[in-house]
């Protein structure tokens, strides 16, 4: 119970310290802390449109966070979520633009294709790790760049005739919901949030309730003991990266089938995959934690857009707040050390 409480307190303390640091930066820079954070709040909850946009931003964050968290829980570091997301995005749009058909066939097929593409892209570093002991961090980082340039080539040379972006996907493959758009003052909120929450339930079930999840966690904790117990270390490493990549591919589908409904040539990474690392760390690599952390980061990202408009505070202040929060979460040992000292002092 005490350990679980500690896991909850560390992120909360990190959030408070991050917000305090943001307030200090605003004060030093000559801005009003009250108006700055008021603008941030209004940018999230001030209008129903902003609420819709916040939930829309949360959706890919949940899935990219799950991708990172799943790998972390099984002893692997998937830094290639950004690349897997781009591959999934392109694959989903390819299916979405290739043909028209019944929505109950077309949309699931596009989602499955995105998950399969992301999973395959994650499987490559998985098999290199399992068979040739190549460290997954190096491979996944390099594969991000391969994915960026490969998907750009496919968009401009395969999906289009030397165009910078594809046409709009068919309505039968779209995650857009007229009902959700209408009730949120025509924001870009779409049905992807349901997919993301279902994915969180699936991760929770696999990790905590299935035999395969126990094997994956055991291999991540101690490969030698797992092999001695009869588990296939190689198979579990590849399976873990496959599932992690599938979550990332779905994150790309949320953008391709929901937010934008097309794929475009990109000059740089989207950042959603890298933000997934922050989401996973802040969420303690648990399914519920990832959902909550995605809500926080998604809210901060959308709310920050309103800060320069309403209060004149640069939106970059929120980037600093997020960075400090992650810094404190990553250095959670220091927070636990201080908490332990305070507890001992209180006992005396």
UniProtKB/Swiss-Prot annotation:
Keywords (A to Z) from UniProt: Cell membrane, Membrane, Transmembrane, Transmembrane helix, Transport
Keyword set includes Magnesium: no
Transmembrane segments: 8-28, 61-81, 85-105, 107-127, 136-156, 189-209, 237-257, 277-297, 320-340
Cell compartment(s), UniProt: Cell membrane
GO molecular function: transmembrane transporter activity
InterPro entries the record matches: ABC_transp_permease, RhesusRHD
Induction entry: Transcriptionally regulated by CodY.
GO cellular component, one term: plasma membrane
Pfam families in UniProt: BPD_transp_2 (PF02653)
Superkingdom per UniProt: Bacteria
Topology with respect to the bilayer: Multi-pass membrane protein
Family: Belongs to the binding-protein-dependent transport system permease family.
Subunit structure: The complex is composed of two ATP-binding proteins (NupO), two transmembrane proteins (NupP and NupQ) and a solute-binding protein (NupN).
PANTHER family: ABC TRANSPORTER, PERMEASE PROTEIN, GUANOSINE ABC TRANSPORTER PERMEASE PROTEIN NUPP
Task performed by this protein: Part of an ABC transporter complex involved in the uptake of guanosine. Responsible for the translocation of the substrate across the membrane. May be a nucleoside transporter of broad specificity but with various affinities for different substrates.
Protein name, UniProt field: Guanosine ABC transporter permease protein NupP
Gene: nupP
């Amino acid at each position: 119970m005490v350990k679980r409480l500690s896991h909850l307190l560390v992120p909360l303390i990190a959030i408070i310290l991050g917000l305090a640091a943001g307030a200090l930066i605003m004060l030093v820079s000559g801005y009003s802390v009250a108006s700055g954070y008021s603008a941030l709040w209004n940018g999230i909850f001030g209008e129903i449109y902003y609420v819709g946009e916040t939930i829309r931003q949360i959706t890919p964050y949940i899935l990219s966070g799950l991708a990172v968290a799943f790998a972390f829980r099984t002893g692997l570091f998937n830094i290639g979520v950004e690349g897997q997301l781009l591959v999934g995005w392109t694959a989903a749009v390819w299916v979405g633009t290739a043909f028209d058909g019944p929505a109950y066939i077309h949309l699931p097929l596009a989602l499955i294709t995105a998950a399969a593409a992301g999973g395959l892209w994650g499987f490559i570093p998985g098999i290199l790790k399992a068979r040739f002991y190549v460290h997954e961090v190096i491979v996944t980082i390099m594969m991000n760049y391969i994915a960026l340039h490969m998907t750009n080539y496919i968009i401009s040379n395969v999906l289009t005739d030397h165009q910078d972006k594809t046409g709009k996907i068919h309505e039968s493959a779209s995650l857009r919901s007229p009902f959700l758009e209408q009730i949120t003052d025509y924001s870009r909120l779409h049905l992807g949030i349901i997919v993301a929450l279902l994915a969180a339930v699936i991760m929770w079930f696999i990790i905590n309730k299935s035999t395969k999840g126990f094997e994956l966690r055991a291999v991540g904790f101690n490969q030698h003991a797992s092999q001695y117990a009869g588990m296939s270390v190689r198979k579990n490493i590849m399976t873990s990266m496959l599932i992690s990549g599938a979550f990332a591919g779905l994150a790309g589908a949320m953008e391709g089938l929901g937010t934008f409904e097309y794929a475009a040539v990109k000059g740089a990474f989207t950042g959603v995959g890298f933000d997934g690392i922050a989401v996973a760390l802040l969420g303690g690599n648990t399914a519920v934690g990832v959902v909550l952390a995605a809500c926080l980061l998604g809210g901060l990202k959308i709310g920050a857009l309103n800060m320069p408009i309403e209060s004149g505070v640069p939106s970059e202040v929120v980037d600093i707040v997020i960075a400090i929060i992650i810094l404190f979460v990553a250095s959670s040992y220091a927070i636990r050390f201080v908490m332990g000292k305070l507890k001992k002092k209180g006992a005396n």
